C-alpha cells in the first residue's frame, strides 16, 4: 500500500513537472538554436561573430568577460532548476513566463535577421559593420539584448527560485552595462547617423 502511494505521488509529481520542463526546454532550445545557428552561418562566410573580450581597454574587457560569465553561468542554473523542479510560483504565472520566453525568442530572431552579417557578440575590434535602423531596430536600439532579457525573465517565472533569480538579475545588469559600452562605440563609429537614430528610438523599446 505504501509502495503504491509512493508511486502515485511520484507519478503525480512527474506529471506536474513535465509540462513546464518541456515548455522551458523548448523556449531555451529555440533561443540557442537561433544564436548558434546564426553564428555558424556567419562562420561559414568567414565572419567571426563572437568577439567578446577582443578589445584591450580594461573597462570594456572586464564588462565583456563578466557578460560571458553571466550568459554562460545562467544556463546550468536554469537546467538545475528544471531538473529538480525548483519553482515557487503558481501555474498561471509560469505559463505567462513561457509566453514571455517565446516573445524573447521572437525578438532575438528578428534582431539577428535584421542585422544580417553585421551581427556580433561583443564589440568588434576591427570588423567594419553597418548601422541598422530598420525592421525591429526602428522600435528598439537593442532588440537582441531585449530578447535575452525577455527570455531570462520568462524562464525565471517558469522556475522561480533564489538561484535562478540571482543569475537572472546578474545577467540583466551586466547586459545593460554592455549596452552602455556599445552605445559609446556606436556614437564614436557612426557619429551623427547614430545620434539622430538615438533621438528617435528608445534604448529598449519604443519611439520618442
Whereabouts are the PLM-identified features?
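Hydrophobic, membrane-inserted alpha-helices
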Residues: 147-155
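Active-site-proximal inter-transmembrane loops
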Residues: 123-148
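Membrane-anchoring alpha-helices and their flanking helix-loop junctions
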Residues: 2-126, 130, 154-208
Amino acid at each position: 500500500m505504501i509502495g503504491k502511494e509512493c508511486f502515485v505521488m511520484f507519478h503525480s509529481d512527474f506529471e506536474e513537472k513535465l509540462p513546464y520542463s518541456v515548455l522551458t526546454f523548448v523556449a531555451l532550445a529555440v533561443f540557442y538554436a537561433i544564436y548558434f545557428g546564426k553564428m555558424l552561418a556567419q562562420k561559414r562566410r568567414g565572419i567571426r561573430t563572437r568577439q567578446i573580450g577582443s578589445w584591450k581597454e580594461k573597462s570594456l574587457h572586464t564588462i565583456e568577460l563578466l557578460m560571458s560569465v553571466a550568459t554562460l553561468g545562467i544556463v546550468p542554473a536554469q537546467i538545475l532548476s528544471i531538473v529538480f523542479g525548483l519553482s515557487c510560483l503558481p501555474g498561471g504565472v509560469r505559463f505567462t513566463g513561457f509566453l514571455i520566453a517565446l516573445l524573447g525568442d521572437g525578438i532575438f530572431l528578428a534582431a539577428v535577421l535584421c542585422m544580417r552579417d553585421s551581427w556580433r557578440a561583443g564589440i568588434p575590434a576591427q570588423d567594419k559593420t553597418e548601422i541598422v535602423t530598420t525592421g525591429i531596430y526602428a522600435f528598439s536600439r537593442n532588440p537582441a539584448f531585449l530578447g535575452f532579457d525577455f527570455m531570462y525573465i520568462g524562464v525565471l517565472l517558469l522556475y522561480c527560485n533564489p538561484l535562478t533569480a540571482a543569475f537572472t538579475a546578474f545577467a540583466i545588469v551586466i547586459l545593460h552595462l554592455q549596452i552602455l559600452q556599445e552605445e559609446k562605440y556606436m556614437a564614436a563609429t557612426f557619429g551623427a547617423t547614430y545620434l539622430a537614430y538615438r533621438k528617435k528610438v528608445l534604448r529598449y523599446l519604443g519611439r520618442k
